[in-house]
Amino acid sequence: MGRFHKFPLLGLVLFLGLTGSLIAANEYACSSTDIHFTRANFPKGFIFGTATAAFQVEGAVNEGCRGPSMWDVYTKKFPHKCNYHNADVAVDFYHRYKEDIKLMKNLNTDGFRFSIAWPRIFPHGRMEKGISKAGVQYYHDLIDELLANGITPLVTVFHWDTPQDLEDEYGGFLSDRIIKDFTEYANFTFQEYGDKVKHWITFNEPWVFSRAGYDIGNKAPGRCSKYIKEHGEMCHDGRSGHEAYIVSHNMLLAHADAVDAFRKCDKCKGGKIGIAHSPAWFEAHELSDEEHETPVTGLIDFILGWHLHPTTYGDYPQSMKDHIGHRLPKFTEAQKEKLKNSADFVGINYYTSVFALHDEEPDPSQPSWQSDSLVDWEPRYVDKFNAFANKPDVAKVEVYAKGLRSLLKYIKDKYGNPEIMITENGYGEDLGEQDTSLVVALSDQHRTYYIQKHLLSLHEAICDDKVNVTGYFHWSLMDNFEWQDGYKARFGLYYVDYKNNLTRHEKLSAQWYSSFLHDGSKEFEIEHEFEHDEL
């Protein structure tokens, strides 16, 4: 991506002298002059946690009557698309959840986001074809263990693991038949766990699921048109510029029906439900001319508004209707009413920011989600800017914490200051040949610095911009199966030794996060290799 220059390693000790207007319940948090940056600088009741997803951590794919998911089949059918890795064992969270909850306790976290695997509950996708009692009990045991340790569960109903039987029967989310089946499954989880779980997410990253799986084909089920750059030659079927919109339309309708069921669930009273969105923040490229000042907001409509606009206002953003035309499905008036205000909070998975440039000449004969947005955000433009050239050699993405604050302020202003939870935020790295070196892997200076800067940016959004953020979940508790990267990308606070019994090892970032969540008394000198201290 951008050109990266190594600078001498710098020490960082965070000192916080924070002032500002007082927020009623957050008076101490936003007026503290304590030099130590700790959780006390955040509002009372703010949840700090970590996050995982069932397919990425559980393993045990053939235990407890679990059925196959779309990703099980994808990793076996196209092993080259996932670095020849699969999640049959993953990090064995299915068997080790109790010891992993002890790690959460060591971190001083009070929240944990995890997903329920649809085929572990309904092995064949529908209740009439059988319920796995072992699967149902597993999640009861997990939730009970979390609660016994004072950890609040945040449950994702669907994190990309469509039951393969539904894929085979009617194409999964390509068919509107999925709406009824998903709603049945979601309602089952609400009725089963709703008295214990009060924070729910229907869908994780519907934008990524739709675009990556059905428009560029680099995630399951790997569908795209042959003309898609980089991935087209690897796609065996699909129709870019069409299928992603159908899939997302069905997800939105399934979300609306599931939320309706949730709000009618007696056990679920007092609970909240939403979607975990995954927008980057976008800055206008310096090559953008003045007549095109809207590439940033236009692209945010396509990446965030695609799903947030309907669940707030009942319909797609006007920019999407204008650019996509007849290929964008339409909602009926009844569907619009059901979608409107169908989220109690907005989940945000934030990792990075990107530059956006108006795309003058998309080819109408080769439609795709990106060409429809009329915005080019190719990484090649990054080297023209110093501000975003913050990417150590091992990092998976550019790092820009200011983008988080900008994004949150945008959501506040455009969507009526909703409650927001940071449902994922994390730093991934590929250590290459040094991946098995504990000395290198555990000294994760960059991740520690990343967390610090993003928490500072989050604090500014809450205290200076008055954004209503109520929780932060770091991705991830531990290294795990990272989709097309397999096990090469590491995002965890704990290192998982894949060659030695999946042993967990505490990283420097885990030590810092634990201290931050305790009292911040332990000072760390953090080394970093970012070109500018603008994160």
Curated annotation (Swiss-Prot):
Keyword Disulfide bond (UniProt): yes
Annotated GO molecular function terms are: beta-glucosidase activity
Q: Which domain of life is it from?
A: Eukaryota
* Subcellular localization: Endoplasmic reticulum lumen
Biological process terms from the Gene Ontology for this record are:
carbohydrate metabolic process
Q: Name one GO cellular component term.
A: endoplasmic reticulum lumen
Q: Which Gene3D superfamilies match?
A: Glycosidases
Q: Which Pfam families does the UniProt entry name for this protein?
A: Glyco_hydro_1
Q: What is its EC number?
A: 3.2.1.21
Which keywords annotate this record?
A: Disulfide bond, Endoplasmic reticulum, Glycoprotein, Glycosidase, Hydrolase, Signal
What is its EC class?
hydrolase
Report the protein name in the record. Answer: Beta-glucosidase 20
Q: What is the lineage of its organism?
A: Eukaryota, Viridiplantae, Streptophyta, Embryophyta, Tracheophyta
Q: Which gene specifies this protein's sequence?
A: BGLU20
